[in-house]
Swiss-Prot record:
Listed PANTHER family: PROTEIN STE12
PROSITE patterns to which the protein is assigned, alphabetical: ZINC_FINGER_C2H2_1, ZINC_FINGER_C2H2_2
Cell membrane in keyword set: no
Protein name: Transcriptional regulator MNL1
Stretches with biased composition (Polar residues): 1-29, 584-598
Organism: Candida albicans (strain SC5314 / ATCC MYA-2876)
Record-annotated membrane-spanning stretches: none
Keyword entries, A-Z: Activator, DNA-binding, Metal-binding, Nucleus, Repeat, Transcription, Transcription regulation, Zinc, Zinc-finger
Phylogenetic placement of the source organism: Eukaryota, Fungi, Dikarya, Ascomycota, Saccharomycotina
Length: 905
């Protein structure tokens, strides 16, 4: 062994980079020589300063490397630089990028320093891996033979650091500056490499294409855990490593490691800032290959394509080679560490010990990481690539377990690999692309695996898919094409809208109504069948007018037997509004209660009566005269005859008994509406007055025959003050509150409208009184003292007529003045009280204006231009401004006319 030690001594002295020596020893096979290799490793460790074996004065210069190459028949450094056509280099500009979770990209030094180091270190590793197995007698012969084999092999040119050589069974991977990224259980590779790959050289299409795939992965897992005995687990733990090799401040690279790496952090070795990690369980070196570096952007798509073309022809040869390697591992400890250097062309689709390529639970869920996916440990910097590469499908832990969706994943992978990589990269941006090659008949939920120890049991079967469509769009409500359920789905047939709450659970032909994937991914694509259920078009709803604003939504919750005989209620149409002769537009079915008008017989009549028993007030009556100025014909309508009054009282009876189809013999025309199954009489100008009373009393109408007599008495009396019947209970308390408020306003409106009565000229003369200067018309209440106010202070003519309150209310002033406001009647802060109408005022001038304008009909203010009279001076002043503007306009027109005449002349 003297010559063996001499060779180690000479190699360690001639190397300027001790990290390559350390890597060469760490990559050796574990076996009976493990203790010897550990001693040699400790001798050449930089932490021991190499004081035991290396004499610093005897280290040669870099110019002596050529002699070393010539001694072992190895080409010089310049020749290997010329042979390497394409070298993948990193970009140091990414070092300034901030990474999440304190994880920085581990970048190599400059390009000029990295390239000689790669070529030098790689061939020294090739040479040093074979040294411990050389005998003293056969040392030089084996060395010359192997070096000549290396020189004759054209595949020895390495394109990328960290690649696998296919001609050697030893681990030839170079370790980068990052710590190993492993999980306690063995982490396997993914079948899809980086989606955002860029092909920069034609060199990638050659033989070592597979080598770049390992740079795109996370780590090289080891499968030696089950092949080593517990005694080897205990004896192989390196306890002699220096403890000062833990993560320290001298390490410029911030690292993130898993649970297994943190436990072994105290025993890690650093050689020139590089981390060499020794896995205590697998007993050979595992290096973390950067997935977040620039190397992950190169040549992944073409590599996938080359692997896809070669995998079918090489499948049998790879399986045979794997069996031979497994048999050799049991007999010779020399081949123990060669298990990780299997031919790596099977990692795309075949089941190998390195790469278990079982697909995920469903090929549709391409945007969702699985349980053992490395993406959940934040392996890459999120700023490097688009989010589609962060959600690639990963693989299962178990070798021989069949995948759940293996048939579809195999079929989809038989296409062009470059197109597969492209479509998977945009499958999360365009969610419908994930359904492109899936069969629609196999959308049932996946069956859980039978093994209880499977990590798939920890996954929930209905995990949420974070798709863009689920944010901006809702799930389309399918329309059932079954004829038996078509009537129950469409609520408003006229408008074409669909009430989604009342839709029954429709049976789907494929049986996937409970499948959560189908509900989210149910939007049809261009390759899906034409007969799939499409989302219904949105029909433009008609504008809701002022009178239908308070209409409650219609809820059709009827059994199927009732649906067969009753038709849904259509919305308001323009031809259903009644236009009176005076221009007053009113709606007569604004309460929202549907009427069931059919001719089915007695059963339908009973249903119609029960439906209309829940009455609501006529809220549209509050807006009866909004926005319309009343003219003289409306202000002084003619009286209503007794015959028309009786006909109006009989209307609810006839509509309740005949289902809204009865008619009368009045002078008006009969129109059938949807308001409480009653008919509306279109009045002629002679019966215009009764139309107002009809709207006032229509809120109390009922189609129930049991309540017809009480309603008849209620409508017949003028002093009817009873509240309307309570409306049906609704689901919203806010709607109930608003209805109560509107009902109270409606009651006050009915009080005022029910008291309207026509007076003749003789009756008005009898009711009014001629005032005198001594007649007290108002009193002032201040501190309990009543002060009388006479007419002399009001500046009224001596023959002024004073009208009572009833006539004032009947007057129907054109402007909205506060005639019966309760606050004016009960506010004690207003001390001036009118004895006629009991209204209070704060100032005496207000009382005078009120009395003169309302109680007297006197208009003392006259316009000198048009001789129009006004009851108030401010109204006269406002009127005079109109005349002033007209005069100014005439003057301006006259001036422009004179100017035009001068110009023409």
């Amino acid at each position: 062994m003297d010559s063996h030690n001499n060779i180690d001594q000479s190699v360690s002295e001639l190397l300027s980079d001790p990290a390559s020596v350390q890597q060469s020893y760490n990559s050796q096979l574990r076996g009976p020589e493990f203790d010897q290799q550990r001693q040699i490793r400790n001798q050449v460790s930089p932490f021991n300063k190499m004081t035991d074996t290396i004499d610093n004065d005897n280290i040669p210069l870099s110019s002596d490397y050529d002699k070393l190459y010539q001694q072992f028949s190895i080409p010089s450094q310049q020749q290997y630089e010329n042979n390497s056509d394409n070298v993948y280099k990193t970009n140091n500009d990414l070092a300034a990028l901030a990474s999440p979770l304190n994880m920085d990209l581990d970048l190599a030094p400059s390009d000029q320093q990295q390239q000689p180091q790669q070529s030098q270190q790689q061939f020294l590793n090739d040479f040093s891996n074979l040294q411990p197995h050389l005998n003293n007698s056969q040392e030089q012969v084996q060395l010359n033979g192997l070096t000549s084999n290396i020189l004759s092999n054209p595949q020895i040119t390495v394109n990328m650091p960290g690649a696998y050589h296919q001609n050697y069974n030893c681990d030839q991977m170079e370790i980068d500056d990052s710590p190993p990224f492993t999980i306690e259980s063995d982490l396997y590779f993914e079948q899809q490499t980086d989606n955002n790959s860029i092909v920069t050289s034609n060199r990638v299409h050659n033989q070592p294409d597979v080598e770049s795939m390992f740079n795109n992965q996370l780590s090289v897992p080891s499968l030696q855990r089950t092949e080593l005995s517990p005694q080897q687990h205990e004896t192989n733990v390196t306890t002699g490593r220096p403890q000062e090799s833990a993560f320290g401040s001298f390490d410029n690279n911030s690292r993130v490691s898993s649970f297994a790496n943190v436990n072994n952090a105290g025993t890690n070795l650093f050689v020139n800032g590089k981390d060499l990690y020794f896995d205590d369980e697998s007993h050979h070196r595992t290096g973390r290959l950067r997935n977040g570096s620039i190397d992950s952007y190169y040549a992944a798509n073409v590599i996938n394509h080359q692997l896809h073309l070669q995998q079918q022809t090489q499948a049998q040869a790879q399986a045979h080679q794997q069996q031979q390697q497994q048999s050799q591992q049991q007999h010779s400890p020399q081949d123990l560490a060669s298990h990780t250097s299997l031919p790596s062309k099977s990692i795309y689709n075949e089941l190998s010990p390195l790469t278990t390529t079982t697909s995920r639970a469903s090929s549709i869920q391409s945007g969702q990481p699985s349980f053992f996916s490395a993406q959940q440990y934040f392996s890459r910097n999120s700023m490097d690539q688009v989010p589609s590469s962060l959600h690639r499908p990963s693989f299962d832990l178990y070798n021989h377990r069949p995948s759940i969706d293996s048939q579809h994943s195999q079929q989809s992978q038989q296409r062009n690999a470059r197109y597969t990589s492209f479509t998977s990269s945009i499958s999360n941006i365009l969610p419908f692309m994930s359904e492109k090659n899936t069969n629609h008949n196999n959308r049932s939920p996946p069956t859980p695996p039978t093994s209880t120890s499977s990590p798939q049991n920890l996954l929930s079967s209905n995990q949420s898919r974070h798709l863009i469509r689920s944010i901006f769009k809702t799930n389309p409500t399918p329309i059932v094409s079954d004829a038996g359920n078509s009537n129950g789905n469409i609520v408003n047939g006229g408008s074409g809208t669909i009430d989604a709450e009342n839709l029954p659970d429709a049976p789907y032909a494929s049986g996937t109504i409970n499948d959560s994937e189908f509900l989210i991914l149910s939007s049809p694509t261009k390759e899906e069948p034409e007969d799939e259920l499409m989302q219904p078009k949105k029909v433009k709803k008609p504008k809701r007018s002022l009178f239908t604003r308070f209409k409650t939504p219609v809820k059709q919750e009827q059994p199927d037997s009732e649906m067969a005989v009753s038709a849904p209620v259509d919305e308001l149409k323009p031809d259903e509004t009644v236009i009176d002769m005076v221009g007053n537009i009113s709606s007569h079915h604004s309460s929202g209660t549907p009427s069931i008008t059919t001719g089915a017989g007695g059963n339908t009549l009973e249903h119609s009566i029960s439906e209309s028993s829940f009455q609501e007030p006529d809220y549209a009556a509050l807006f009866e005269n909004v926005g319309k100025r009343k003219n003289k014909s409306y202000r002084k309508p003619k009286g209503k005859t007794k015959e028309e009054e009786q006909q109006q009282q009989q209307l609810p009876l006839s509509s309740g008994t005949a289902g809204g189809t009865s008619s009368n013999n009045s002078t008006g025309t009969v129109e059938k509406t949807l308001f409480f199954n009653k008919t509306k009489i279109k009045k002629e100008p002679a019966s215009e007055r009764s139309s107002l009373l009809d709207n006032a009393s229509a809120g109390n109408a009922s189609a129930s025959s049991s309540e017809a007599s009480s309603i008849q008495n209620a409508i017949g009396s003028d002093d009817h003050n009873g509240p309307p019947l309570t409306s049906a209970p609704t689901s919203s308390t806010l709607a109930n509150a608003s209805k109560r408020i509107l009902s109270s306003k409606l009651i006050s409106k009915k009080k005022s409208t029910s008291k309207l009565k026509e007076y003749t000229a003789a009756e008005l003369e009898d009711m009014c009184t001629v005032s005198s200067l001594e007649t007290p018309v108002a009193t002032m209440i201040s501190k309990g003292i009543e002060v009388e106010v006479d007419l002399a202070s009001l500046d009224l003519p001596p023959d002024t007529k004073i009208f009572p309150t009833s006539i004032i209310n009947n007057k129907n002033r054109t402007r909205g003045r506060k005639e019966n406001k309760e606050a004016d009647l009960s506010d004690t802060s207003k001390i001036y009280l009118c004895n006629l109408c009991q209204r209070r005022f704060k100032r005496h001038e207000h009382l005078k204006r009120h009395f003169r304008s309302l109680h007297t009909f006197e208009k003392p203010y006259n316009c000198d231009i048009c001789h129009k009279k006004f009851s108030r001076s401010d109204n006269l002043n406002q009127h005079l401004k109109i005349h002033k503007q007209e005069d100014e306009k005439d003057c301006a027109d006259a001036e422009t006319g004179v100017g035009m005449d001068d110009a023409s002349g």
